[in-house]
């Protein structure tokens, strides 16, 4: 059984850097929506280039697609659209097709994710199958239902899982508050790459242009710029994470 001693013994906050995360640690991204993967794309690109095992599990949803984007498109069709957008962005990222899976979980009539036993067991099956050491997902202290419920369920899974595991909870545009333990700083060249990655989610790009006056790409990068300024970094941008360790014994410290 692998132990997460390297991460457990660190002092925080600090930047993710070369050699910080051992390449034998397995990484799972648990995305409540298509595009949550892309929102932390720079960190995940670093891990892919670090040769970590990387799998992305995306919860299917049709939320966030305005009726005006494709008139007469039903909720199931919107979910299919968002799945195609995620597949296209993952292809641009360089993620192999078999490393990206989509999962239909129980929702209410408004397409809100339910925090029920059925969904808990579905997520437990994903974790048991992929056997991750690290799970990335949006922080649960968030105004978005999907982020809150997914985080709650994954925390339950992690607490009852048979192996040590650490959650990397990322700061999102809808995060209310969180502690920053790790961050990935980056400059303009990487920001341009990330913006292109984000624009594959055209339904979200167009919705943000209409409702906010700027695109989805700019919305995420504005957050990344704010994170860098909050941390007092020289870098223009950063992605930020709070860590939660589960099943790591004190004697491993």
Model-identified regions with their sequence ranges:
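The feature marks non-catalytic terminal segments
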Residues: 1-22, 85, 91-98, 110, ...
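Active-site beta-strand->loop->alpha-helix modules in alpha/beta enzyme cores, enriched
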Residues: 1-165, 196, 248-251
